[in-house]
Amino acid sequence: MEFIDKYFRESKEIIDNLDKKQIKKMVDYLVNLRKNSGRLFILGVGGGAGHASHAVNDFRKICGIESYCPTDNVSELTARVNDEGWNTSYVNWLKGSNLIEKDLILVFSVGGGNLEKEISVNIV
């Protein structure tokens, strides 16, 4: 039980420290996106790519928001990596998606990326 109690305490502490204003701001962005028929592009690498792919399903099915993820099309993504390089694969995929002003980009990242250390440079 000690582990479970510790887990619950730590989870509560994290939840208590979430910025409610920022969460509300994100909700407002998503509500406006749906109202204006914008598209949501969700990016992630590693585990974040799996979360991005699953989030596309939830936003489409539950929220009625047109959503896309570059890692859902492995053929296109790997062709871009092969032809253009990993560092520009996502930005070029986004360019090919013809983003417009009413669209949004959501990025799942654990480390946030770092150009100097070459960590998740394709999402920076």
Where are these regions (language model features)?
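Short amphipathic alpha-helical segments, especially helix-boundary/capping motifs
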Residues: E2-Y7, L33, E66-Y68
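Generic N-terminal amphipathic, Lys/Arg-enriched alpha-helix
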Residues: M1-L18
